[in-house]
Amino acid sequence: MKEKATAFAVGATGYPCIEILARGHTHWSMALLGGICVLALVWIARRYPGMNIAVQAALGTAFITAAELAVGLVVNRALGWQVWDYSREFGNVLGQICPLFSFYWFLLCLPVFGLLRLAARWKAKRTSEV
């Protein structure tokens, strides 16, 4: 449970920080989405530990993109909060997701999965030494 809470906290902090760096602002809903997305990335890393890291990143990207679509449809379209709008981006879906930002998520997933692999190896080594 502690590991899940830590993963959620990392995502809830990191996701908004990425948005602030990229866009200059964020919204509290992005903290919730970030926490959920990092939990999903951790699950993928644990479920498929030997999988090629690019394939893991593609799975992570698919989850994040789907989550952004779902959250965007609620916070932007249904509630009208206007947290983000990709309607001017090529290939956008209802202004909520687009290929460019999915590509960015893929690039960000690569080092995340690399770090998760290192953490798993470190944990395994630490456990075997006890």
Task: Briefly describe each language-model feature range.
Residues 1-130:
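Aromatic-rich, lipid-facing transmembrane alpha helices and their immediate juxtamembrane interface loops
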